[in-house]
């Protein structure tokens, strides 16, 4: 009797990451509908929402311990829809529907996204890769490719028609993005980038500017992100080549991080883990009140 509330709650938490992935697919597909109805701003917003959900579902799964092979496959399929099919159809419906050449470019992009995702999944199971490769993507990741393609529509919404809306420029840009997706150029994983403590204040200030730009100039912000990402590629190539020549440097960095975490734990030996998601701590008074434990009885 006492175990039913806990088991029901555990099941609900286990399906949360997959639910977020399904919601991201719905957002990506709905962006196509708004593009066909000539509402490009709503289409861009929905693709952005799909990207946010895609970035959160994996982290939520790790926090809840709900990682599974099925979840990985759903996430990969969601990336193909949200960052491959949806941006291509949105761009075609809003800017390239008047020319057959545009359709060729639009076909090329999602095909390259699928090939890139297939290679990513294959590399996950490859245990022969050096340890330092964990810090890099092989080729442009699918979300970055989607931002690059949608950035073309953002230019039109910000500045109107111009050479940046011409068919030749659109096709060249989409083709270039597609080639970056399937290339073997190393690109840094953003979650591996750490901010030094003495730059913490600068980082917080930049976050404030970013938040203001989301509201005041979202389309210009998209291009700031695109250009910043493209500019980081030469540094990522140099960093990857240096690590390939000095793999012991990555091992030393990992060891230093491990030692720092261990030193922090030793500095606070009596520190208690912070309970997450409101889960009740065994032996707490709240469990006695809720009927999950009898007073005076310990869990074994």
Curated annotation (Swiss-Prot):
**The reaction(s) this protein catalyses:** a CDP-1,2-diacyl-sn-glycerol + L-serine = a 1,2-diacyl-sn-glycero-3-phospho-L-serine + CMP + H(+)
Enzyme nomenclature, EC number: 2.7.8.8
Q: Which GO terms describe its cellular component?
A: plasma membrane
Q: Name one GO molecular function term.
A: CDP-diacylglycerol-serine O-phosphatidyltransferase activity
Its domain of life reads Bacteria
- Does this entry carry the keyword Transmembrane helix? yes
Give the residue spans that cross the bilayer.
10-30, 74-94, 95-115, 135-155, 162-182, 207-227
Q: What InterPro entries does the record point to?
A: CDP-alcohol_PTase-I, CDP-diaglyc--ser_O-PTrfase, CDP-OH_P_trans, CDP-OH_PTrfase_TM_dom, CDP_ALCOHOL_P_TRANSF_CS
Record-linked Gene3D superfamilies = 1.20.120.1760
Keywords carried by this UniProt record: Cell membrane, Lipid biosynthesis, Lipid metabolism, Membrane, Phospholipid biosynthesis, Phospholipid metabolism, Transferase, Transmembrane, Transmembrane helix
The family classification in the record reads: Belongs to the CDP-alcohol phosphatidyltransferase class-I family.
* UniProt-listed PANTHER family: CDP-DIACYLGLYCEROL--GLYCEROL-3-PHOSPHATE 3-PHOSPHATIDYLTRANSFERASE-RELATED, CDP-DIACYLGLYCEROL--SERINE O-PHOSPHATIDYLTRANSFERASE
**Protein name according to UniProt:** CDP-diacylglycerol--serine O-phosphatidyltransferase
The taxonomic lineage of its organism, from the top, reads: Bacteria, Bacillati, Actinomycetota, Actinomycetes, Mycobacteriales
Q: Which gene encodes it?
A: pssA
């Amino acid at each position: 009797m006492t175990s039913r509330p806990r088991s029901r709650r555990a099941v609900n938490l286990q399906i949360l990451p997959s639910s977020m992935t399904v919601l991201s697919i719905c957002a990506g597909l709905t962006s196509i509908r708004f593009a066909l109805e000539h509402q490009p701003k709503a289409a861009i917003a929905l693709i952005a929402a799909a990207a946010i959900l895609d970035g959160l579902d994996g982290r939520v799964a790790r926090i809840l311990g709900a990682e599974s092979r099925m979840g990985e496959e759903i996430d990969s399929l969601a990336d193909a829809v949200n960052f491959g099919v949806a941006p291509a159809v949105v761009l075609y419906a809003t800017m390239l529907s008047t020319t057959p050449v545009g359709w060729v470019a639009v076909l090329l992009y999602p095909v390259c996204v699928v090939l890139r995702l297939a290679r990513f999944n294959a590399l996950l199971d490859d245990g022969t890769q050096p340890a330092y490769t964990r810090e890099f993507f092989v080729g442009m990741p699918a979300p970055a490719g989607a931002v690059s393609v949608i950035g073309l529509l953002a230019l039109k919404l910000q500045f109107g028609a111009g050479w940046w809306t011409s068919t030749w420029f659109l096709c060249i840009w989409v083709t270039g993005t597609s080639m970056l997706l399937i290339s073997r150029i190393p690109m840094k994983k953003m979650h591996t980038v750490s901010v030094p403590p003495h730059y913490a204040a600068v980082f917080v200030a930049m976050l404030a500017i970013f938040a203001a730009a989301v509201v005041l100039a979202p389309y210009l912000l998209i291009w700031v992100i695109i250009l910043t990402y493209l500019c980081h590629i030469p540094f990522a190539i140099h960093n990857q080549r240096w690590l390939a020549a000095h793999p012991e440097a990555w091992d030393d960095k990992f060891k230093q991080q491990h030692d720092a975490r261990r030193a922090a734990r030793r500095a606070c030996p009596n520190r208690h883990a912070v309970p997450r998601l409101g889960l009740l701590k065994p032996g707490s008074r709240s469990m006695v009140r809720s009927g999950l434990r009898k007073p005076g009885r310990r869990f074994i």
